[in-house]
Amino acid sequence: MIRQVLPPSVEQLEAARRVIADHLIATPTITLSLRGRPVLVKMESLQPTGSFKVRGALAAVDAARRDDPNGAVITASAGNHGLGIAYASSVLGVPATVVVPKNASAAKVKKLGNYMIELIQFGSSFDEAQAHGMALAEERSIRFISPFNNSDVIAGQSTVFDEILLQAPELEHLVISVGGGGLLSGALISRDAHGRADIRVTGVQPYESAALYHVLRGASMAEVVHRPTIADGLAGGGDDGSVTNDLIASHDVPLLLVPEIEIRRAVREAAENNGIVIEGSASASYAAITNDLVDDATSRVGFIASGRNISLELLLEILQEPLA
């Protein structure tokens, strides 16, 4: 049963900004040339865990600690949110359990093993891992922290957009990769708070696993078909009752679908042409821009390099693929 969650309050937004300022860097927003077009790139891949998700994790674990200084937390994750919870656990001193599916990225599982957490591999999908994590939370009477359906997590993710506005006020259109919708929801909340409705926001999902895209068109999560994708951080995910669904629907955000082959090409192009390593989840946004899926040829466009946690084996495989 999905617990009803409200959008973050002003107090939650302020608390998230404080704990993130104490423990994380303000990642730079740089300009890269994507097939000759200057594009603003928010380098969240430079975070200590290699992903923006550490922001929401820090905010949520900090909130749990303030509510119960002697408590513990548990989460389910495809990898990056789990790394964020593990990092937050280490710096805030809160015991944590992370449940990941058995097919989670080997690179992310290896990094999780470096933290003093309880790591559980369960199920063949994020949804199965999440169900197990929620059952354990109830059994142990500890807090479950969803990667997206959590107001403190969304508050933490909103700080990405806060920083972009300070670093690149000229931004006119931001493209955001979407799984459960935590980052997109955070960006929308920040945009509203700063009175920047002039900035367009577009979401991107992998064609092979686009739960939110279909749910916002009337499907239930159970009806959505998921196929393998290298954008593993966007795969599966989503809850029928998630607050992110309502936030995104109320802002009428367009969602685009990107084919798997273009996500793979974007990983390669980012490395070969721009010298940056980004995982498939971030590459979905890159691909949407470079393949002209974003209907905006003149605006100052940007995207979030949301993570770098791709295995060396997969990266080498993609780099060695013949160019079509």
Model-derived regions, located:
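PLP-dependent amino-acid enzyme catalytic core
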Residues: M1-A324
